[in-house]
């Protein structure tokens, strides 16, 4: 029996699983969380055992990915044995806006701190508000109630992205203030090209990939067909989590 276990587990993998940090890190990864260098202990643990843990997770048909920016996350395959879900189109668009803000001069000017309201305003500024409202409700006519629902959806999207490790709350949990993690580059694979990153991200947002019901479905179908080619749009599955507001 012992020999069989040793055949399945390398000594280093056994050490990784026996490490006190493993249960916490494993739970976070399975929930869809991205682990960057700001999580010092957990990040160091993953860096030390990256190869062994990747082999471990491949048994569940998922991969342990270390992005070019350095953060870790699990990328499910179509046959994954770990539960997954898809980010909504608005959540993905909010993620793109966060990536844009991360690259913007305002990030340095504001010491890296943004608010939920700023994200909402930037989203309206960069995208067509009418199309955004239609994306949430095809019958939306631009009423105050429609705009209120959009604001609530934006807050929910930010809250979910926070739970995925893409932003970090600052101060009181109800302050609505946060910093943006490098893991938002899951939404900006295209900006790794030779083009100016800020202009590339701005172009992506203005193209309105999540603008209308038809384009939303076309984008979703395209993402599924090219699952292995994009850092986010082709790897958009995350663990289901309950909605909760950050503001």
UniProtKB/Swiss-Prot annotation:
Organism: Histophilus somni (strain 129Pt) (Haemophilus somnus)
NCBIfam families found in the cross-reference section: PRK05256.1
Quaternary structure (record): Interacts, and probably forms a ternary complex, with MukF and MukB. The complex formation is stimulated by calcium or magnesium.
Protein name: Chromosome partition protein MukE
Biased composition (Acidic residues): 236-247
Lineage: Bacteria, Pseudomonadati, Pseudomonadota, Gammaproteobacteria, Pasteurellales
HAMAP family: MukE (MF_01802)
InterPro entries membership: MukE_C (IPR042037), MukE_N (IPR042038), Scp_MukE (IPR007385)
Keywords on record: Cell cycle, Cell division, Chromosome partition, Cytoplasm, DNA condensation
GO biological process: cell division; chromosome condensation; chromosome segregation; DNA replication
Family of the protein in this entry: Belongs to the MukE family.
Basic and acidic residues bias (residue ranges): 217-227
Role of this protein: Involved in chromosome condensation, segregation and cell cycle progression. May participate in facilitating chromosome segregation by condensation DNA from both sides of a centrally located replisome during cell division. Probably acts via its interaction with MukB and MukF.
């Amino acid at each position: 029996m012992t020999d069989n276990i040793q055949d399945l587990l390398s000594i280093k993998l056994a050490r990784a699983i026996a490490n006190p940090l493993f249960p916490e890190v494993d739970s976070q990864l399975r929930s869809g969380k991205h682990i960057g260098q700001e999580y010092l202990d957990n990040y160091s643990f993953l860096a030390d055992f990256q190869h062994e843990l990747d082999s471990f997770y491949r048994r569940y048909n998922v991969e342990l990915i270390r992005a070019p920016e350095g953060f870790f996350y699990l990328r499910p395959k179509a046959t994954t044995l770990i539960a997954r879900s898809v980010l909504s189109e608005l959540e993905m668009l909010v993620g793109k806006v966060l990536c844009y803000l991360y690259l913007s001069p305002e990030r340095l000017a504001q010491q890296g701190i943004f608010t939920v309201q700023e994200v909402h305003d930037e989203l309206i500024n960069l995208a067509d508000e009418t199309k955004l409202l239609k994306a949430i409700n095809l019958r939306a006519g631009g009423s105050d109630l429609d705009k209120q629902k959009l604001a609530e959806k934006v807050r929910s999207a930010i809250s979910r992205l926070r739970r995925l490790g893409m932003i970090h709350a600052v101060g009181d949990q109800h302050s609505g203030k946060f910093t943006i993690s490098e893991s938002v580059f899951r939404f900006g694979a295209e900006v790794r090209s030779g083009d100016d990153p800020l202009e590339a991200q701005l172009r992506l947002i203005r193209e309105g990939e999540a603008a209308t019901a038809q384009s939303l479905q076309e984008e979703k179908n395209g993402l599924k067909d090219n699952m292995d080619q994009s850092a986010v749009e082709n790897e958009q599955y995350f663990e289901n989590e309950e909605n909760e507001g950050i503001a």
